[in-house]
Amino acid sequence: DVYKRQEVKENMPAFDEIMNLSDFFKVMGDSTRLQLLLSLQQSEMCVSDLANVLDMTKSAVSHQLKALRLSKLIKSRKEGKTVYYSLDDEHIETILGMAFDHTKEH
């Protein structure tokens, strides 16, 4: 019906917001980055620890962490010479949990 279509159209987010959401899912759509996020969901970790857990080089881990940091999915803090990474906020943890639950159900 015409009113329903108009209501849907009026409630559609702005194009910029849709593009931001699309970029978010592109970053989340990489299996290596998902492994990093799932690791960081359990514990704050440094590059060496993440490389060990995922059996990757430190360079490869650093490259993926940069993408996650630029997308504001993770944050970092420095302690001495070591940089520790963690999820940026509880929204990321919730999204990961909901997505994981959804895939287990289907």
Positions of PLM-derived features:
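Conserved segment of winged-helix/HTH DNA-binding domains
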Residues: 20-21, 86-106
